Amino acid sequence: DVCSSDLIMEATTLSEARVYVGTYAKYNNGSLYGAWLDLSDYSDKEEFYEACRELHEDEEDAEYMFQDWENVPEGLIGESWISENFFALRDAVEDLNDTEQEAFFVWCNYKSHDLSEEDADDLIKAFQDEYIGQYDDEEDFATQIVAECYELPDFAETYFDYQRFARDLFMCDYWFDDGFVFRAA
């Protein structure tokens, strides 16, 4: 119900994040030996690095090389580092469904949020304040607003210009990106 802002959202792929962990020494000696580690198995960065140490216990002071990764957003990992904020963000989005998580990253990108620096809980709260839902296009959203918020007689619905109403809504009050509608803040 758009009028009362009681919107239902959907789950997360951060829970499926994984990293292939090798070392620079092995790589420089022609070996790609390593293993895929599921980040959901670790509560924080320190636990993850402990698993890396165990995996490469044959090396003293191993320099870990993250040779590949899946479901880790840009800016939270590189070849030789992983952001502490990944684990906080993963935990913060735990209650979001897949659709909401996708919308969250669209929102973060549109707003140019730095996922490696900003507080994960604050990001989720701000996202939830602005997220409306998933729609085919701006006119689809405008049609729903009219249906839920205005009691137009049946004959008037056929004359209502949903396209212009959508244009007006998205001029200042809302924005649309990649199938998602957000409140302009």
For the regions a language model picked out, list residue spans one by one.
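Short, small-residue-biased leader/transition segments that mark boundaries at the very start
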Residues: 1-4
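N-terminal ordered "arm"
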Residues: 8-58
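Acidic, proline/glycine-rich low-complexity IDRs
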Residues: 9, 13-15, 139-185
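Non-transmembrane, interaction-prone alpha-helical and coil segments associated with secretion
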Residues: 12, 17, 70-81, 95-102, ...
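Structured domain cores in non-transmembrane regions
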Residues: 43-114
